Amino acid sequence: MKRPAAKSLLTAAILGSALALSACASTRVSPVEVTRFLDPATRAQLGQGSIFVTGVGGEDSLELAPYKAAVARELARVGYGETARAAAGQIAEVRVSRYQLGQNGQRSPVNVGVGGSTGTYGSGLGLGIGINLGGGGGPEIGTEMAVVIREARSGRVLWEGRADFTASENSPLAERAASAQTVAAALFSDFPGNNGETIEVEVP
């Protein structure tokens, strides 16, 4: 009389495991596409000295805060010392866009930190066409970050870069804090990078 119950429990356990594996398999994360531009003549100025991190146009919204914090951590890792604007030798301007990527590759805004192009190299950062790298399934949430580093005194652009990736909406990396660290870490990997080069950084 006890065997059918045991068999039912085993069947339920197998079904539960299968459903869990299915949920894991449906989580998709693309590589981070990174493009960077720099003035070779000023390469020596990068990765040292004091820097102030801000949103484009002084934007200081709560939505932008985790991205600014992630950028500040990466800048410290590559050699900068974060300081107040008045004492900074360089300024890092951060722009972030979050979007939903449909199966046809079209973007629908989720939320926007600061819009528009941020640099002066004619790169039009943030205006690229999104490509859905995942298979079938639900929508994907994309995060795009652009950062420009300028001389504080002259406003001259020393470096600019963009990082963009997508994750299925059920992935932990679709959350704001996790996506902030993901794009920032990729953007500043092997900093400052090569002028005009686009690379893909795998997400661990």
What are these model-derived regions, one by one?
Residues K2-R3, K7, S22-V78, E197-P204:
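A structural "domain/chain start" motif
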Residues A70-G81, Y99, A186-N194:
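Structured segments of extracytoplasmic/periplasmic soluble domains
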Residues R95-R156:
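Surface-exposed short loop/turn segments
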Residues G58-E59, R98-L101, F165-T166:
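Solvent-exposed loop/turn segments at secondary-structure junctions
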Residues T11-S22:
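Bacterial N-terminal signal peptides
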Residues T83-G102, V203-P204:
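Acidic helix-start/capping segments at beta-turn-to-alpha-helix junctions
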Residues G47-G49, V71, V78, A88-A92, ...:
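Envelope-exposed proteins and targeting segments
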Residues A25-R43, G136-P204:
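C-terminal/domain-edge helix-coil "capping" segments
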